[in-house]
């Protein structure tokens, strides 16, 4: 069965109602015939709150404990989305980075993904699971410690899973309905692009566009992962959003 990766950012899972909406988006793709891997961010504002707690707790900076704390927001979101899907009758299971495992370097707070073995999740798909909900932004080092990938790391997680599982596409759900020539929230004349090349997307990112994290676009370009940027808050059709792909695709 074909696989699809869907990534939901913090605003898309900001509260329980939005998590329910994300579950509906996932169910639509199951109905379209996909096994779905969902990557989730922490609920909007939660990571900043966790960072604040760390800073209030100790003036000492321990990178390993910092990552252990700030990665927990994604774990909460993953569990809540899996429960929401189960409640509607969809076989779903949440996975934290160490459970997959998402193997990374030991550079805490800026780790790089080295490897994502397919076996554990593929086995669950083979036995009836329809949705794997993955906590983004995190992994595990060779020393067995939780690591984080840096701000925007959930985008990188999503692309890495799409490459590892040979997904048909990686859909990035956010609070805008695609990639624009400039920020539509501050510029009325901003124009939405139906498709854009990896190189053009990297150029926009270098100029400050925050729709996709730069590292995730570089990874998508390397492994030829087709990306689609969509709004969580609009009905999705075949022509929705912006497709980010190879110029010749």
Tell me the role of every PLM-derived stretch.
Residues 1-218:
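Nucleotide/pyrophosphate-binding catalytic subdomain
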Residues 54-56, 222, 246-247:
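Short, solvent-exposed amphipathic alpha-helical segments in soluble enzyme
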Residues 222-229, 235-239:
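Structural preference for solvent-exposed beta-strand-turn elements
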Residues 233-249:
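Long, charged amphipathic helices and adjacent flexible linkers at domain junctions
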